[in-house]
Amino acid sequence: MKKLYLAAIAGNLGMLSVGQFLGWTSPSLAVLMQGKDEGYPIHLTPQEAAWVASLPTLGGIAGAIICAVIINIFGRKNIMLFTVVPSIISWLMIAFATSLTELYISKFTAGLAIGITLTVTPIYLGEISPPHIRGNLTCMSIVAVNIGILVEFVIGPFLSVQNLTFVSLIAPCLFMLIFIWLPESPYYLMSCNAKEETINSLVQLRGKKDVYNEACNIEQFVKASLDDQTDFRELLCVPSNRRTLIIMLCLSIIQKMSGYQAILNYAQIIFDQMNVNLEGKYLTMILGVVQLIFTIICMFITDHSGRRSLLIISCIGTACSTAMVATFFNLQYNHINTKDITWLPVTGIITYIMMYALGLSSQPFTLLSEIFPMNVKALGSMIILITKDFFEFVVITSYLIIADIAGIHVPFWIFTACNFAGALFIFFYVPETKGKTLEQIQKELQRLSKQ
């Protein structure tokens, strides 16, 4: 099993790189909007900053589409290794950009890497993991993302934009050097009729030679899945697939409309508007640490508590937290003295991150890795990633505009409503998948679709 954990850790170095792309925005935008980095030739207006923050989501849509087209041709491992190319190109372009156009292109390229990575990594991890620890290993991806975010939050305020990008180059290079030696997904190998290679992959991943029964189960599952067509009709017309798609689409919208993207990208700016004694950059660091700690907690409890219960608790908790922030800014907007309750929005934001990390951060990702059948997994994942990126783009670009026109409290009230609605949807429609094999999950979805 050592090779399994090594494969999961190495594979998640790509997710750490995703986290660094996401985390770069908060400290860097604060510097570039205020013109504090004299050595960097680009300074941003609020509108330009919104585009820099949101362009990776458009690149992510393109990346998800590309990944869906090529993942079953080149395999999970090769596609994961390919993400190193746009990652390195993007960081180098950011470091040496001399115009706003070049910075825009670099962020779109970063989105390509993010979109491909977020599509292929959960598929790979879901297919190499045994059922009893699949939740832990897929949650590890979100831990890796949050480590990447924390690195940028901690060192970003103290480095120049260019030096920060050079540090960020380490993760994709390290990922390539380690991951190249690890095995391909046994499910993908079996789909290529490479039974001997499948057994070799399982031997490496399980650390034992007696993998014949598992290989036979994989062969039956892959054969049954691939006997069906791989197209939109199969995804939309088969009741269990359609139910799965609707569940994951709604979860994606709930996740992105919960407010996390606004808080992540504009954390330092939001904290600076609270008029608290501690500088925004230090509060942002605290935010990153809290997020990492609670994501690690989630990783260890997800296969005990279950995906569904964590999602419900997370939605209720984030709703209460954003309501606290909205209340403070609502009072401030109406010129009511808030001097004695400056603790309220800080508590709300930190509590939000705690509750988001416990469920909404990782559980949709875990479900994505296990809920689609083989024949429509790439197609379904592509649609989900496109939906996520679209709503992420909407939240990032509209937050500053709505906050400027109507007040900061308005977007936070919207986030509150979406989180409460999300808790209700999850309670009534999302199935529990903990401890089940991929085959058992499909049988359960087929049973639910007949009711």
Where is each model-derived feature located?
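Short, well-structured alpha-helical segments
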Residues: V211-K223
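Alpha-helical transmembrane bundle of multi-pass membrane proteins
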Residues: M1-E197, S201-V203, A224-Q451
